[in-house]
Swiss-Prot record:
<feature type="compositionally biased region" description="Basic and acidic residues">
    <location>
        <begin position="208"/>
        <end position="222"/>
    </location>
</feature>
<protein>
    <recommendedName>
        <fullName>Pentraxin-4</fullName>
    </recommendedName>
</protein>
<feature type="binding site">
    <location>
        <position position="408"/>
    </location>
    <ligand>
        <name>Ca(2+) 1</name>
    </ligand>
</feature>
<feature type="binding site">
    <location>
        <position position="407"/>
    </location>
    <ligand>
        <name>Ca(2+) 1</name>
    </ligand>
</feature>
<dbReference type="Pfam" id="PF00354">
    <property type="entry name" value="Pentaxin"/>
</dbReference>
<dbReference type="InterPro" id="IPR013320">
    <property type="entry name" value="ConA-like_dom_sf"/>
</dbReference>
<keyword id="KW-0479">Metal-binding</keyword>
<feature type="glycosylation site" description="N-linked (GlcNAc...) asparagine">
    <location>
        <position position="91"/>
    </location>
</feature>
<keyword id="KW-0106">Calcium</keyword>
<feature type="binding site">
    <location>
        <position position="406"/>
    </location>
    <ligand>
        <name>Ca(2+) 1</name>
    </ligand>
</feature>
<feature type="binding site">
    <location>
        <position position="408"/>
    </location>
    <ligand>
        <name>Ca(2+) 2</name>
    </ligand>
</feature>
<feature type="binding site">
    <location>
        <position position="322"/>
    </location>
    <ligand>
        <name>Ca(2+) 1</name>
    </ligand>
</feature>
<keyword id="KW-0732">Signal</keyword>
<feature type="glycosylation site" description="N-linked (GlcNAc...) asparagine">
    <location>
        <position position="67"/>
    </location>
</feature>
<dbReference type="InterPro" id="IPR001759">
    <property type="entry name" value="Pentraxin-related"/>
</dbReference>
<feature type="region of interest" description="Disordered">
    <location>
        <begin position="208"/>
        <end position="262"/>
    </location>
</feature>
<keyword id="KW-0964">Secreted</keyword>
Length: 478
């Protein structure tokens, strides 16, 4: 822009003198006609004015263009400065980013090293845990095998113990007839030193039972008829007969003084419940029931029925099943038969025709989830047994446990055709399987097995016509 303006100004300065020189030379020419000359001069003046105007306009355009170019240059310089500042800022930020990246790379390298160490430790832990889990699995398998073997051995041992107990009971029933005196009982039951025998766990238990039977025979009076009911000979309590349920089973049987009673009497067995008729109002609750799950059960009681059939002795119901544990008989069943139910609909039919004679009898129903074995003892004698009945089952806690009625709902739904009519005494429940020696001692009133979880001391009358009494002897109960 500056160069073009300078060229135009130079051209104007050169052209004006030349033009003025030409005009002066024309004036010095010979005088001719004056009009054409003035006209030409006016035209030249007009041309000059137009030229001046054009030149002025052109100069103004040049000046304006110069100003614009100057402003553009200023802007370009400012932009260049700004771009330079931006470049410097970018350089500074790039430097800081590079520094941060270097720090991050250092941290990443540290984390990678730590990660490799952690991976190494994790692999070592995995190997250790794998070895331990395998070892624990092997130990669990070994423990399971040992437990199964122990359960099998225990089941076989229980079967042997109960069979030996039944044989001992049968022998005891025959011995008074075969040997009138008590002096012959010792050699007949206990092996002499000249007859050594290998004493395993079963033999030791058998020998103890024989010694107990021998000791019991020393207190027996003249031999009685073997067909008579078995008598309990417990020392009668000091108080007389009264209609309350405050009596309990002996807390510590070793502190009780046992002495023979009159033959034919059953004494000192504890509280007695009398169910006079088949009313559905005749019900007794055992509280608090089962507080823990049961994998074994023993139910023992003295029972006397007043009708030609057996009703419900025991009923345990929960919210999901009203027949978790039942000992009941209906008037439609075979007289003297009773259904032993664990976890409806599984049941076994037990023969109890011996109880229909209107006399007192001692019964024990025993069950264990190990191989599902069960036993029924009546007056110390094993009358029924079996296996594979609810094997591995657990009787759940938290239900309603009643005597004398069969529950179709928790605590209700009674039916008079299933009601018990008669008397119960000395009732007790254990959370384990009693052995034959304990059953025999309980039946003869020699010793009360330890660990009972429920007795008639836990009974609560729910109205109706049920009567409670503490009788010195069962034969004197109403």
């Amino acid at each position: 822009m500056g160069c073009s303006w300078r060229k135009t100004l130079s051209f104007f300065l050169v052209f004006v003198p030349i033009y003025l020189h030409g005009a002066s030379s024309q004036e010095a020419a010979p005088v001719g006609p004056r009009k054409p000359f003035f006209e030409r001069l006016r035209r030249l003046e007009e041309q000059f004015r137009r030229f001046q105007e054009v030149t002025w306009t052109h100069l103004q355009n040049i000046a304006s263009n110069y100003n614009v170019s100057y402003n553009v240059d200023v802007r370009f310089r400012s932009l260049a400065e700004e771009s330079q500042a931006v470049a410097q800022a970018v350089n500074r930020s790039q430097a800081s980013v590079q520094g941060e990246l270097a720090q991050l790379k250092a941290w990443v390298r540290k984390l990678q090293r730590r990660g490799r160490k952690v991976d190494t430790r994790l692999r070592a832990l995995d190997l250790t845990l794998g070895e331990r889990s395998q070892q624990r699995a092997r130990e669990r398998k070994a423990h399971k095998a040992q437990r199964d073997a122990l359960q099998d051995s225990l089941a076989r041992l229980e079967g042997l113990v109960h069979s030996q107990g039944a044989r001992l009971a049968a022998l005891e029933g025959r011995l008074p007839v075969a040997h009138p005196g008590t002096a012959a009982l010792g050699p007949a039951l206990v092996p002499t030193p000249t007859q050594p025998e290998e004493l395993g766990p079963t033999s030791l238990k058998l020998q103890r039972d024989r010694q107990e039977l021998r000791a019991a025979s020393e207190h027996r009076g003249p031999p009685q008829d073997s067909s008579a009911p078995l008598q309990g000979r417990r020392e009668p309590p000091a108080s007389g007969s009264h209609r309350v349920l405050s009596g309990t089973a002996p807390k510590d049987p070793r502190q009780q003084a046992w002495s023979p009673q009159v033959p034919g009497e059953i004494c000192g067995v504890g509280p007695t419940l009398v169910f006079p008729n088949a009313s559905t109002r005749n019900v007794v609750f055992l509280s608090p029931g089962f507080v823990t799950a049961l994998r074994a059960l023993s139910f023992c009681s003295w029972v006397r029925t007043a009708s030609g059939r057996l009703g419900t002795l025991l009923s345990y119901a929960t919210e999901d099943n009203d027949n978790k544990l039942v000992l009941h008989g209906r008037d439609s069943l075979l007289p003297g038969s009773i259904h032993f139910v664990i976890g409806d609909p599984a049941f076994r039919e037990l023969p109890l025709q011996l109880l229909l004679d209107g006399q007192w009898h001692h019964i024990c129903v025993i069950w264990t989830s190990t191989q599902g074995r069960y036993w029924l003892h009546v007056d110390r004698r094993l009358v029924a047994t079996g296996s594979r009945f609810r094997e591995g089952y657990e009787i759940p806690p938290g239900g309603s446990l009643v005597l004398g009625q069969e529950q179709d709902s928790v605590g209700g739904g009674f039916d008079s055709s299933e009601a018990f009519v008669g008397s119960m005494s000395g009732l007790a429940i254990w959370d384990r399987a009693l052995v034959p020696g304990e059953v025999a001692n309980l039946a003869i009133g020699k010793e009360f097995p330890t660990g009972a979880i429920l007795t008639l001391a836990n009974a609560a009358l729910a109205g109706g016509f049920v009567q409670g009494a503490n009788c010195t002897c069962l034969e004197r109960c109403p």
